Amino acid sequence: MSHHPKKVRIGLIQTTCGASPQDNLAKAVEWIRRAAAQGAQIICLQELFTSQYFCQIEDHRYFALAEAIPGPSTEVLGAVAAELEVVIVASLFERRSAGLYHNTAAVLDADGRYLGKYRKMHIPDDPLFYEKFYFTPGDLGFRAWQTKYAKIGVCICWDQWYPEAARLTALHGAQILFYPTAIGWHPAEKAQYGERQHAAWETIQRGHAIANGCYVAVPNRVGHEAPDGGPGLQFWGQSFIADPSGQILQKASPEQEQILVQELDLDALDVQRTHWPFFRDRRIDAYAGLEQRFLEDRNV
């Protein structure tokens, strides 16, 4: 029986972001067109691409940036998706209701249809990453969507530190796991901790690719942002794509705007999972403890 190899070309967009949401959306559309012109069929934008990273401070003014999903931005992007016949993953600030907001990724299929959304499950509260002030933790669980070109899953930035998130998304059948991201260096920490911070970030996501036998694709923003003065953040770019063995297929610049376009062989997932059968050997009867916050000594 003949078999036609299943391949797909994905695109990651790494750019700077300015103060105007309208300009940022227009820029995203322009770069989506560039990625599509290079052959990308599934295109992922970076986290919260319609604004600068406002979570560096806690300020109620920034709630005005939020919008409904589906809503104005997904309408624009859906039309572009249909025109170019590309799948788009778009990370947006979602206004769900009065006083209820999420950090959310919308998935638009190649015919422009809105397939659904993922709400960021893990919300950080670190210096210059004060997301708990703005975002309610997600309540939709981990998901995957069958698009025209591949079955994809989406997690967002801080989710990337949690193996459970990648695992559950892969168990929903995701062949490619996208992580739209906004991560960078605190200026006071870069000299001492910068190299190890970046290495840890890259390493753990390569590990997700290995453990789950899937592709991992991570678009990060780039450039220095200090929307309210102060030291700001230096976003380290270096968006990357890893294969199911954890090898980096492409990596972007730490300083420049860039598009990564990479062909992925989806048939390689079956080969990888057959030779490294981690799904086969999982002890699903032994993991109940993962539902606990911490496992106390039973003798106490």
Q: Where are each of the predicted segments found?
A:
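N-terminal active-site segment of His-dependent metallophosphoesterases
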Residues: 1-42, 178
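Active-site-proximal beta-strand elements of phosphoester/diester hydrolases
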Residues: 7-19, 104, 117-120, 144, ...
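Short, glycine-anchored, charge-dense loop/turn motifs used at functional sites
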Residues: 10, 107-115, 240-250
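Cys-nucleophile CN-hydrolase/nitrilase-fold catalytic domain and related Cys-dependent amidase chemistry
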Residues: 21, 30-117, 183-207, 211-212
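CN hydrolase (nitrilase-like) catalytic-core segments centered on the catalytic cysteine
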Residues: 66-89, 151, 157-259
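Short beta-strand scaffold segments in enzyme catalytic cores
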Residues: 90-92, 104-107, 143, 239-241, ...
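A short, polar/charged loop-to-alpha-helix boundary motif
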Residues: 120-134, 256-273
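Cysteine/selenocysteine-centered motifs that mediate thiol-based redox chemistry or coordinate metal-sulfur cofactors
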Residues: 142-175, 181, 269-300
